[in-house]
């Protein structure tokens, strides 16, 4: 799957910002067809970071969320600032 097609949006909720700061995790809305491996490759290619782990879930609204934990040498806060999640 094309990396540009995998990620739909970055989640900007209070919980998502808290996870960025405390757990080095970013939250994305992704396509339902995307696998964890697709999400990992898309984040690594689009944002130039290394991913440690990906957890996914399908919300009651029918959206697929991906919680992406970055490797310790990368800071989720720096990427979040670039993406406009944190000002």
Protein language model annotation of sequence segments:
Residues 1-87:
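Contiguous, often N-terminal, cationic amphipathic patches that form binding interfaces
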């Amino acid at each position: 799957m094309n990396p540009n097609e995998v990620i739909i949006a970055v989640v900007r909720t209070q919980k998502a910002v808290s996870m960025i700061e405390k757990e080095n995790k970013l939250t994305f809305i992704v396509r339902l067809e995307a696998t964890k491996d697709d999400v990992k490759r898309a984040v690594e290619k689009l944002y130039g970071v290394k991913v440690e782990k990906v957890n996914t879930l399908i919300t009651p609204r029918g959206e697929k969320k991906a919680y992406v934990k970055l490797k310790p040498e990368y800071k989720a806060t720096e990427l979040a600032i670039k993406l406009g999640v944190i000002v």
